[in-house]
Amino acid sequence: MRFTLKTTAIVSAAALLAGFGPPPRAAELPPGRLATTEDYFAQQAKQAVTPDVMAQLAYMNYIDFISPFYSRGCSFEAWELKHTPQRVIKYSIAFYAYGLASVALIDPKLRALAGHDLDIAVSKMKCKRVWGDWEEDGFGTDPIEKENIMYKGHLNLMYGLYQLVTGSRRYEAEHAHLTRIIHDEIAANPFAGIVCEPDNYFVQCNSVAYLSLWVYDRLHGTDYRAATRAWLDFIQKDLIDPERGAFYLSYHPESGAVKPWISAYTTAWTLAMVHGMDPAFSERYYPRFKQTFVEVYDEGRKARVRETAGTDDADGGVGLASAFTLLLAREMGDQQLFDQLLNHLEPPAKPSIVSASLRYEHPGSLLFDELLFLAKVHAGFGALLRMPPPAAKLAGK
């Protein structure tokens, strides 16, 4: 992530933590870390985000025209500055959005801001700049009509989280329409779930879609989530290596082919979301997942994650194994692994707070600050499903 703005001030880790408990001893907070793991896990109890999370929110909101959540319009200057490929923008917006939902749950004073940003996130998600690859690749001009669960699953979950956070019915009709499309497509398919591109089935993208059905049920008292059992049975029977606690890379229903490589980022993403729906499922495979993929190093202070088996290389493939495992560790309440992974991920990215805004000089992946933000604030997908309504609803807006 590179910015054209000049650096005017850099806040030290100790100064950053002022006002959020006593600063940790140097041995507890390595250079390049911005808060302790204990402080991240205590945010909800304290009803306050850590100062570095507040600085991340400033990055997302503060600078006119170029902050990601400046306006509902189809301007994407923030992503251009980060050199985010068009096909990745949908994921960037979605993971920001899931973090914003947790911010709303953590701090009642920030709930209105989180809802405002979620509104902008949904609006931007519908811009053709976000979904245009579907048309460009020749798959159709309507990104939600069929398939494309890699896009419409996120959009549906974002619709639901926006209404949970704000109480607003702004997108309720669109949400109902898309939920029916997803549910009916699942019911019509001879396999459990929906493909991304034609004949490309990814379990992690389906985890988003099924979780979106649970959120819809929470809002409207329906029972779309009943489809989840058949999906979990399917992926457990056909798409997971039970000995290694890992999902295979992809499934191709027309031929029945399953790519034989297991994938850490696929598994971490999926187990994190499934834990919100069926905790026992994720808890069954989490220890085996760690044994298969996680390498602890630097005398126990750090951990990194192999993307697949048979290699010692960390973060191969799409480069997101460690970051998604950070989210999974947070979802599972695993403070030790969360701390080790953050020690591995954050310091090399050279974070700084400039004019109250967090930025990373050397982000480690295309979704680096999105996933670190999400993991730092993540209250748990089950907790989001149980989110209490806002004190004052924006009904009808």
UniProtKB/Swiss-Prot annotation:
The record lists the catalysed reaction(s) as: (S)-linalool = beta-myrcene + H2O; (2E)-geraniol = (S)-linalool
Induction info = By monoterpenes such as limonene, myrcene and alpha-phellandrene, but not by acetate.
The terms describing its cellular component in GO are: periplasmic space
Q: How does activity depend on pH?
A: Optimum pH is 9.0 for the linalool dehydratase activity.
Keywords in UniProt for this one?
Answer: Disulfide bond, Isomerase, Lyase, Periplasm, Signal
Task: Kindly list the biological process annotations in GO that this record carries.
Answer: monoterpene catabolic process; monoterpenoid metabolic process
What is the name listed in the Swiss-Prot or TrEMBL entry for this protein? Linalool dehydratase/isomerase
Q: Which organism is it from?
A: Castellaniella defragrans (strain DSM 12143 / CCUG 39792 / 65Phen)
Q: What is the lineage of its organism?
A: Bacteria, Pseudomonadati, Pseudomonadota, Betaproteobacteria, Burkholderiales
Task: Write the gene name.
Answer: ldi
